[in-house]
Amino acid sequence: YHRSGKGVLVTTTTHMYVEADTDLSCDFFALRDKIIKDGYCMAGQKISEQSKPKMCGLPYDLLDRLIKDMPQALDYVIIEADGAKHHSLKYPAADEPVIYPLTTDVIIVLGTWEKGKLCKDVVFRYELMQNELGMAEDVVVDDSVIDMLRQVYVKKLRDSGFEGRISTYYR
């Protein structure tokens, strides 16, 4: 989006690793100025000082204010909502996905590069998936497993009251 001249803010609802040039100030004016100047800003709150620092998302009141006060400069807010801890696929926990209340569109990203491998080796929270769905130990990732995970996410989103658009990106 940024390459097409659109103003973009990127954050998370839970936590993620801090990328280079991420703004961790949680300062409205600093974030506003960066979006206006650069057309792009990744932002959050720092939560760890480890060798690879992590951040959590912007406070919702700050996110609300940025969206409300910057309609001329902020075209898209992209919020990572449910990471898979470096796995290609994930089975969501009971309280996931966590989405920002004013979300209009959700893109479910599903990794397809590990088809043919055992689910237990590539699905984050496989044990939960196995317990809830009664899957056998030797189930292999194929299109039906990937589609089942997509359906689980869609159901959880709809059950949570999300009425916006849901699309899927197969990576």
Residue ranges with predicted function:
Residues 2-53:
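N-terminal phosphate/diphosphate-binding loop that engages ATP/GTP or pyrophosphate donors
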Residues 8-12, 42-45, 77-81, 87, ...:
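General beta-strand structural signal in soluble alpha/beta enzymes
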Residues 26-35, 121-140:
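Acidic, Ser/Thr-rich peripheral helices and adjacent loops at domain boundaries
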Residues 13, 81, 111-112, 132-139, ...:
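G-domain G4 guanine-recognition motif of GTPases
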Residues 140-161:
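A short, acidic, amphipathic alpha-helical segment used as a generic capping/interface helix at domain edges
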Residues 83-86, 102-120, 136-146:
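Conserved Switch II/interswitch segment of TRAFAC-class P-loop GTPases
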Residues 48-91:
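Phosphate-binding/switch loop-helix module in NTP-utilizing enzymes
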Residues 93-115, 125-132:
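Inter-motif core of Ras-like GTPase G domains
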